[in-house]
Every structure is written in C-alpha cells, then in structure tokens.
A protein has these predicted regions:
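Active-site beta-strand-loop-beta-strand hairpin of nuclease catalytic cores
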Residues: 48-66, 70, 101
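Amphipathic coiled-coil/heptad-repeat helices and related helical stalk/stem segments
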Residues: 43-44, 87
C-alpha cells in the first residue's frame, strides 16, 4: 500500500506543485521562472512556471503556497483557514494582468489535507470565481512530492 504524507512545509508544497506542472500538458517546453525559498522568507509569488510551445507562447502559472508545517518541520500554530486567507490576499495583491484575457493562471497551493476546508470557504465567492483562481493540493506519495489540480469548474458554484 502506498504511503501518503499530507503534513508538508511550504517548500515541499512548492516542490510538489512544480513536479506536477512538469508532468502537465502536451507542450514541448516547461520552465520554472521563479521559485521562492520559504526558509529564507523570500517575498513575491512562490512559484512562477511557464508551459510553452516552440515559439514561446503558452500559459504562465503564478502560484502562492502555504504549508501546514514550519520550515523547520514543526507544526504551524495558525489554522489552515488563516493561512488560506493570507494566501488569497497575497495572490490578489500580486495580480497584474486580467487572467480572463491572457494566458495567466493564478493558484494557491497547500497540503492536500487542507483542500476540502478551503473549497468550502471559496465555493460561493464571486470574485475568486471571476479570477478563475485554482487550487493545488500537494502531497508526498512513496517519497515523491506531487500535487492535484482543482480547476475553477470544480471549485465554484
């Protein structure tokens, strides 16, 4: 039976989403543009990733991540709903381009164990539906970090 771990640091969540995005899509080029290091408390979007074709056209992913463990591996004191609200605020403040008219995809990544609670927080939120915000649930299975993507059609009523 596969061992699944849902308690992750922010850096592990970022790595899981990055691994997932490398496997996603049919494009020939996948590249990481920026990765923040939570242990060094770097500012800005945590992960900027681009899936592109030979001509450089494609989708830009801007992901804000939150873990349920501190960078030293100890449990977080705040609840997942507080971390999620903080991530929403950060991603909204970082939005520079309307995602409806461009190939910009905004998302929030967190441990998969926190996803169901966060889905309930946003399912009726018109603004987040309008932004087409995605969720990514990171987890570790058999020693490999990966993630599950939750699309807007699955999140909002």
């Amino acid at each position: 039976m596969a061992e699944i771990q849902d308690l992750l640091t922010e850096n592990q969540v970022i790595e899981g989403v990055q691994n997932f995005l490398y496997q996603k899509g049919h494009t020939t080029h996948r590249r990481v543009v920026t990765v923040a290091d939570a242990a060094r408390k770097e500012h800005g979007v945590d992960l900027v990733f681009k899936l592109e074709n030979d001509k450089g056209h494609g989708n830009w992913y801007f992901i804000e991540a939150k873990g349920n463990l501190k960078s030293d591996g100890t449990p977080m004191l705040s609840k997942h709903s507080t971390n999620f609200r903080w991530a929403i605020a950060q991603i909204i403040l970082d939005i520079k381009v309307d995602s409806r008219n461009n190939n910009y995809i905004y998302g929030i990544a967190m441990p998969r164990s926190d996803i169901e609670h966060c889905k309930k927080l946003i399912e009726d939120n018109w603004a987040l539906k309008h932004l087409r915000l995605r969720l990514y649930g990171a987890f570790c299975q058999d020693g490999k970090l990966t993630a599950v993507e939750y699309l807007p059609k699955d999140l909002y009523k």
